A protein has these predicted regions:
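Catalytic cysteine-centered active loop of the rhodanese-like fold, especially the PTP/DSP P-loop
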Residues: 77, 81-123
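N-terminal, post-signal-peptide region of Sec/Tat-exported proteins
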Residues: 54-78
Length: 123
């Protein structure tokens, strides 16, 4: 019985560690969480992508990734359709610590975007 409990606990831990994706229950589209290094590789090798900075105006003004578009996470729902017309476009999302980029990525998925990669914060 102890072995079964141990296996269940290990399984739950594994699922929680590897299940870091947002899922839209209707269409099972997810965003991918990537590292900052993976995001940099994409920026260095790909041509057709958009970078979303999910921070505030003030944070953006203090410094941001070159060519990033400022759409604070709390404005994604109202601005995405207009500013991001191609829902299949590769979109890289970041913020300061990673919390807002996750929220923004989840919202993009809910809005129907299919190629969202979230790379956390830039602290």
């Amino acid at each position: 019985m102890k072995k079964v409990k141990g296996l269940i606990i290990m399984l739950l831990i594994s699922l929680s560690l590897f299940g870091i994706t947002a899922c839209d229950g209707e269409n099972n589209v997810t965003y991918e969480q990537i590292t900052a290094e993976q995001a940099k590789t994409i920026m260095d090798t790909e041509k057709d992508y958009i970078i979303i900075d999910a921070r505030t105006d003030e944070e953006f003004a203090e410094g941001h990734i070159e060519n990033a578009i400022l759409i604070p996470e709390y404005e994604i729902a109202e601005r995405a359709e207009k500013e991001l017309p191609d829902k299949e476009q590769l979109i890289l999302v970041y913020c300061r610590s990673g919390r807002r980029s996750k929220i923004a990525s989840e919202e993009l998925v809910k809005l129907g975007y299919t190629n969202v990669k979230e790379f956390g914060g830039i602290i």
